[in-house]
Amino acid sequence: GDVFSYQNRSLLLAQYKRVLILAGPQIDVDEVESIHSFAENLQAPILADPLSNVRRYHKAGAIDDNHEVVSNCNNDTNMTQDKQVSDVVISTYDAFLADKELWPVLKPDCVIQFGQIVVSKRVQQMVASWDNVEYIEINPTMDSMNPMGKTTIHMQASIDMFTHLFAVKNESNAYLNRWKRLEVAGKAQLSTAIEEPSCFEGRTIRELQQHIPDNSQVLVANSMTVRDFDYFWFSGESDAVLYGNRGVNGIDGTVSTALGLATNHQPTYLVTGDLSLFHDLNGLAVAKTHNLNLTIILHNNDGGGIFEYLPQKGTKYFDYLFSTSQGLDYSGAAKLYGCGYTKISSPDELVPVLAKVSEESGVHIIEIPTDREYSRQLHRKYTNVSVDMEALL
């Protein structure tokens, strides 16, 4: 039976003025609006993992094209028309949370987790550093999705059920506004990646989000790709649905999964590194036999770029054991499987190529050569968010 009486349900969250919501992968797209309405009433910021698809939704009164907080977007010509816009969704958290001085300032009274834990290591470390915080974990199976071991209340419920039964209105927006100011600063900084003159994963993602059709679906590969999306795929700028294969063997079947998505005949994209593509190259054969359409955005840095950011960097045999360069010519792979192929040498070429490929059938590989070490430097440059602590306090 329901262990919470109606009175207890109303009191559970009413006692907290600072509630933080974590929205991770494995949230059904049909439940996103419930999370949104729940958070708005609670004045609770949502740290939305890109694979949660909570970033797809916005409601009037958020951040305009100049990254300014606006109070009424009905009269704001800079806002995207006919889109729901929300100011509770936070998408640039992994950048500004690099400043650990923010962690105690952003400490809530209560954390609510929907779906799996977010991919951001900084968010996990920040939450793990907080003591005496209620941590409510919601999932329909009672499987623990919280690797930090911070859960104080584990509730078996669907998201729709929980957000309906435990809805409460919070009159104080002070905590939410603190996160919103950081989001403005984060977007202002990260958006400058679109001006990067060299091929860079961050610029690709910004271009992709702005130029693919709203009804698109994107499979996001593992390793650095999903983490780059965490940085550069902003809230409220696309209705595209993001998918991912997360887990220990998440690299398995990347191409095949993307082609499976393409069977619904929606515009479908795969954004991947070279190792993930190489791992499931034979999956391309399925496209021809089933007449499937797929655009593959291949960032080819000839190896595993994520290890440039990990402690293994600089160790003996690093390139051989971790970077695992393959030195493959993917134009040959495209020819082998009957795919279209374009290799770009300048980021300015991407948008015209995307437009051209959208009118073609079959699989098309757009190869973007990048450099692992230089990408790491650019990553540091574009994700360095300056925070005014005095204004925040």
Task: Give names to the regions the model predicted.
Residues 25-27, 51-52, 116-119, 223-225, ...:
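Short glycine-rich anion-binding loops that position phosphate/pyrophosphate groups of nucleotides
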Residues 135-137, 141-177:
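Terminal amphipathic helices with adjacent charged low-complexity linkers/tails
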Residues 180-265, 387:
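Active-site diphosphate/adenylate-binding microenvironment
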Residues 13-29, 191-198:
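Active-site donor-nucleotide binding/catalytic segment of nucleotide-sugar enzymes
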Residues 89-93, 152-164, 341-346:
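Short acidic-hydrophobic, aromatic-tinged amphipathic segments that line or gate anion-handling sites
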Residues 23-136, 238-263, 267, 279-281, ...:
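Glycine-rich, anion-gripping cofactor-binding loops and their flanking helix/strand elements
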Residues 228, 233-393:
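Thiamine diphosphate
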Residues 1-14:
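Conformationally flexible catalytic loops at phosphate/diphosphate-handling active centers
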